[in-house]
Amino acid sequence: MSKIDFRLEKTFGYTTGACAAAGAYSALYFLKNNEKLNFVEILNLKGDSLIIPIKNIEKRGNTAVSTVEKFAGEDIDITNGMDIKIEVILENWDDGYPKPSNVIIIGGTGVGLITKSGLQIKPGDHAINPKPREMIETNLKSLLKDDEYVTVKISVPTGDEIAKKTLNPKLGIVGGISILGTTGIVRPMSNEAYKESLAPQIDVALANNFENLIFVPGNIGTKHAKILLNAEEDQIIEVSNFWDYMLDKAKEKGVKDIMVFGHAGKIVKLAGGIFDTHSRVADARNEILCAYASLVSQDVEMLQKILQSNTTEDIVEILTEKGILSEVFNKVSKRVVERLSLRWEGINFSCIVIDMKGNILGKSD
């Protein structure tokens, strides 16, 4: 078990789920003890202690509203700095009233509403994931008497606008962000929250009975998969740079058939065994394409140009002029399939590589 004091910590951050748990605890504590806390110490589900600052807290009667500012540490997170408001209403059970839970959690403005099947939460409910719900309940129950219960309402004033820059609209989560986080801790450069938002795409696809999924790096792949492959929105899985993570999830969930489809600049990295395609991890595009071009032509001048090219599009132009474009990218596509099949056994892979305009450069079969 460890303790992280986020009043001092600058490297690690805390999740939206941890914000909600901290805010709920501070609001209930204020109602019970008439004392405003500038910070609270809560436990995550692993038993780690998280000390989280409280930005503001107000009380009116049996209701208190706490505001917690999301902090991502050194991680890149679109939700960093946004306010999360947690309203807690403290009440007593009526005699004879059934008591299913003494912590009721609901979503308010800026928290998304689920509209598609396949996610961890059923359609019609707000996008507050099970682990954050459990963290809130665990921390509040220590403050409650047997005859007391609370309603916890989570709102995000800027959630609707922020959600437009996330995958929530694609997942059928409308009107706001999701409240996420397994451990409550955001680790630098881990992109945990972002990864956690990517994986549910697979659940939605499987819930809609798609057997062949199309994995794309991002918007270019999505756009042209719809045009060239007549693919449906829920069949297309945006991977971003996290091929290893998303393919692990696909295998875990029993996916049997995956087409890798997208722009050459990202897909060629897979042929080199690079499964996190962010440029800060590795950028061997020129070297990989030079190697495959050398299998087709030993023109040293051409190979030198490939190595010195600024963009993948420049290399496409060089290979086109030489008349070997398709031959090179067919080899690249086949190697992508070989690489992925070796690591993720049991999944049938295929691959199509395109340029920015959606022209097919190469296929695995």
From Swiss-Prot:
Metabolic or biological pathway: Cofactor biosynthesis; adenosylcobalamin biosynthesis; cob(II)yrinate a,c-diamide from sirohydrochlorin (anaerobic route): step 6/10
Lineage from the top down?
A: Archaea, Methanobacteriati, Methanobacteriota, Methanomada group, Methanococci
What Gene3D superfamilies does its record include?
CbiD-like
Catalytic reactions on record: Co-precorrin-5B + S-adenosyl-L-methionine = Co-precorrin-6A + S-adenosyl-L-homocysteine
Which biological process, per GO, is one annotated for this protein?
A: methylation
Which SUPFAM superfamilies has this protein been placed in?
Answer: CbiD-like
Q: GO molecular function: any one? A: cobalt-precorrin-5B C1-methyltransferase activity
What EC number(s) is this enzyme filed under?
A: 2.1.1.195
InterPro entries, A to Z: CbiD, CbiD_sf
The name on file for this protein is: Cobalt-precorrin-5B C(1)-methyltransferase
Q: Name the Pfam families for this protein.
A: CbiD (PF01888)
Which family is this sequence assigned to? Belongs to the CbiD family.
Family annotation (PANTHER family): COBALT-PRECORRIN-5B C(1)-METHYLTRANSFERASE
For this UniProt record, give its keywords in alphabetical order, as a comma-separated list. Answer: Cobalamin biosynthesis, Methyltransferase, S-adenosyl-L-methionine, Transferase
